[in-house]
Amino acid sequence: MTIARGDFVRIKRKESYWYNDTGKVASIDKSGIKYNVTVKFDRVNFYGISGTDGGNVTNNFAEVELEKI
């Protein structure tokens, strides 16, 4: 099953902060890079800069690390 922009996916990379969480595909890079799928999440991760709110709401994954839902 091919993943496309706008699809909802479950993260299968065990070392990821978002493991087994769901997100929406924001973009897919066709240039041949390893982690070509950018996924956007509803909540931020724990990587905030000292003294500021928030963290990352997107992360890049390889297609094999994602499960389309």
Swiss-Prot record:
GO cellular component terms given for this protein: photosystem I reaction center; plasma membrane-derived thylakoid membrane
Gene3D superfamilies membership: 2.30.30.50
Pfam family, one: PSI_PsaE
InterPro entries xref list: Elect_transpt_acc-like_dom_sf, PSI_PsaE
SUPFAM superfamilies tied to this protein: Electron transport accessory proteins
Main localization category: membrane
Domain of life, source organism: Bacteria
Entry's Gene Ontology BP terms: photosynthesis
Record membrane topology: Peripheral membrane protein
Keyword annotations from UniProtKB, A to Z: Membrane, Photosynthesis, Photosystem I, Thylakoid
Location in or out of the cell: Cellular thylakoid membrane
Function: Stabilizes the interaction between PsaC and the PSI core, assists the docking of the ferredoxin to PSI and interacts with ferredoxin-NADP oxidoreductase.
Family statement drawn from the similarity comment of this UniProt entry: Belongs to the PsaE family.
Alphabetized PANTHER family for the sequence: PHOTOSYSTEM I REACTION CENTER SUBUNIT IV A, CHLOROPLASTIC-RELATED, PHOTOSYSTEM I SUBUNIT IV
Protein name: Photosystem I reaction center subunit IV
Source organism phylogeny: Bacteria, Bacillati, Cyanobacteriota, Cyanophyceae, Synechococcales
This protein's encoding gene: psaE
